[in-house]
């Protein structure tokens, strides 16, 4: 009976939290970044808790979205989910607001493999490999400043979002939401490969500091 009650509570809370945790929420506790992996070819999208929270192991993810901003000729292969299951669910090429850009959104489907948060550490969400001939930039959308942010000419909802609940902290259920992006030059800590339960320091990607975009050029 206790199991049934807990399951019902989880489902109902996730439904209500999904409504609350939408792209563009201005206050939150979770930060995203994108960088190259150790092979210098694959790109990874990571989440990290900010300094205000200390997540327990009893978290549950209810919603999520990651939107990449690339050149309009961008293509990729080998999308691999590492924390949660992610699928491409929208793409817009050359909108009038940013005709040189493409906006590719990846939606969260299920918390399998589970997204495991740890204080001051990165968790890898998914990876992908850009086409060999692509030499443009790849960055995460800035929800509040991008020219294609909602409302836009396509009536779409690009943006970054992650909504989680923590059942294991004192004081009752805690809610964590996406806050902003962070970039290289910060102390990112070790990465957590959620599906493999291993920790490995990630190499530094080359970023355009003023834009937070990852370059495909190899480090010199």
Give the label of every model feature segment.
Residues 33-37, 46-48, 69-71, 107-109, ...:
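A structural detector for beta-sheet-dominated domains
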Residues 1-8:
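Bacterial N-terminal signal peptides that target proteins for export
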Residues 46-47, 89-137:
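Structured beta-strand segments within beta-sheet-rich domains
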């Amino acid at each position: 009976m206790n199991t049934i009650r807990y399951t019902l509570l989880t489902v109902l809370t996730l439904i209500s939290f999904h409504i609350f945790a939408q792209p563009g929420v201005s206050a939150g506790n979770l930060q995203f970044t994108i960088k190259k992996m150790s092979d210098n070819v694959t790109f990874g999208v990571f989440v990290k808790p900010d300094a205000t929270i200390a997540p327990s192991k009893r978290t549950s993810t209810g919603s999520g979205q990651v939107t990449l901003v690339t050149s309009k000729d961008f293509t990729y292969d080998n999308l691999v989910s590492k924390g949660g299951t992610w699928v491409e669910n929208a793409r817009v090429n050359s909108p009038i607001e940013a005709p040189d850009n493409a906006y590719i959104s990846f939606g969260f489907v299920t918390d399998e493999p589970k997204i495991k948060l740890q204080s001051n550490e990165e968790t890898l969400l998914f990876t992908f490999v850009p086409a060999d001939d692509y030499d443009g930039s790849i960055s995460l959308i800035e929800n509040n400043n991008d020219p294609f942010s909602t409302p836009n000419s396509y009536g779409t909802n690009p943006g970054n979002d992650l909504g989680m609940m923590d059942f294991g902290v004192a004081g009752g259920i805690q809610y964590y939401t996406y806050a902003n992006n962070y970039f290289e030059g910060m102390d990112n800590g070790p990465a957590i490969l959620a599906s493999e339960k291993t920790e490995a320091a990630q190499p530094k990607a080359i970023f355009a500091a003023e834009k937070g975009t990852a370059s495909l050029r190899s480090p010199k």
